[in-house]
């Protein structure tokens, strides 16, 4: 059989394959699955990213602290030297006392390192107590009982201060008799100014103060009498000063008078000349030293 076929142009499959097939049909099932999986992974990564996380996005980011410039104005507490400048004596003493109470070793350093108190500085303190006592006295006519209980607290404070300060100026703590005698002179003058209560029961404060200061005088006089036979006591006019104090106290300085008589060997009865009496040419010691009594 002879069959004649009409010639036809050759057909290349790759030229018409994409033209006739839709995109959905051209993708294999495996390709679709891979596409969906990749998209899901991308969605998951986007969900876990810091930008999409609500927890991380709401957390404030830590910023570096701003460095304060040297010339920038900002509040700050005072330095210790400036703070101490603002404290008065009472405030500074209170702060120091509290520190020493909490730290006994610091208290010991203060005791050993502080300068020795002078007679004038202690007298100023005692005068402060005396001023408080004077301010506590009520105005007008009042009963002795009312007046006593009004001034009792500052009176006791003054007596206690005298008792505490006096041993500081007594031997052997104080080795200079002149300084001891200067303090006792000032302390005795303060005791003279204490009120004389009409009822005897209220006078025990002043009576006890006289007795204690008289014993202090006696101690200093006995120590001073060991030096140069007590000549310095008389040449400084202390025998006459003590005589005046004894007269003003109503004879309550018996211990001191006895010690002065023993140390010096005499006691000038003149009490009006005070310290200047030492230069009196008629004083007993000056007469002895000048030989007047020997020539008489």
Curated annotation (Swiss-Prot):
The keyword Zinc-finger does not apply. It is found in: Cytoplasm; Nucleus. Residues 1-64 are annotated as: Disordered. Residues 49-60 have a biased composition (Low complexity). It comes from the Eukaryota. One of its GO terms (cellular component) is cytoplasm. Keywords: Cytoplasm, Nucleus, Protein transport, Transport. One of its GO terms (biological process) is nuclear protein quality control by the ubiquitin-proteasome system. Its main location: cytoplasm. One of its GO terms (molecular function) is proteasome binding. Binds the proteasome. Belongs to the cut8/STS1 family. Involved in ubiquitin-mediated protein degradation. Regulatory factor in the ubiquitin/proteasome pathway that controls the turnover of proteasome substrates. Targets proteasomes to the nucleus and facilitates the degradation of nuclear proteins. This is Tethering factor for nuclear proteasome STS1.
């Amino acid at each position: 059989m002879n069959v004649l076929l009409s010639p036809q142009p050759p057909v290349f499959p790759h030229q018409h394959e994409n033209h006739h097939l839709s995109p959905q049909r051209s993708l294999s099932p495996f390709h679709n699955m891979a596409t969906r999986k990749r998209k899901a992974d991308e969605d998951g990564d986007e969900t876990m990213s810091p930008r999409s996380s609500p927890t991380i996005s709401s957390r404030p980011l830590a910023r570096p602290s701003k460095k304060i410039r040297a010339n920038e104005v900002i509040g700050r507490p005072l330095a210790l030297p400036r703070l101490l400048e603002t404290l008065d004596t009472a405030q500074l003493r209170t702060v120091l006392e509290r520190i020493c109470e909490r730290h006994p070793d610091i208290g010991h350093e203060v005791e050993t390192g502080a300068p020795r108190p002078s007679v004038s500085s202690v007298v100023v303190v005692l005068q402060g107590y005396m001023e408080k006592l004077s301010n506590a006295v009520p105005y007008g006519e009042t009963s002795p009982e009312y007046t006593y209980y009004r001034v009792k607290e500052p009176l006791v404070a003054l007596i206690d201060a005298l008792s505490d300060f006096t041993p500081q100026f007594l031997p052997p703590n104080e080795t200079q008799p002149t300084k001891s005698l200067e303090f006792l002179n000032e302390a005795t003058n303060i005791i003279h100014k204490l009120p004389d209560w009409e009822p005897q029961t209220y006078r025990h404060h002043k009576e006890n103060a006289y007795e204690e200061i008289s014993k202090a005088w006696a101690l200093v006089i006995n120590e001073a009498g060991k030096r140069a036979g007590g000549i310095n006591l008389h040449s400084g006019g202390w025998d006459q000063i003590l005589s005046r104090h004894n007269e003003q106290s109503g004879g309550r300085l018996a211990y001191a008078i006895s010690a002065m008589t023993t140390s010096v060997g005499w006691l000038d009865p003149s009490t009006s000349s005070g310290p200047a009496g030492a230069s009196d040419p008629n004083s007993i010691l000056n007469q002895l030293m000048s030989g007047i009594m020997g020539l008489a």
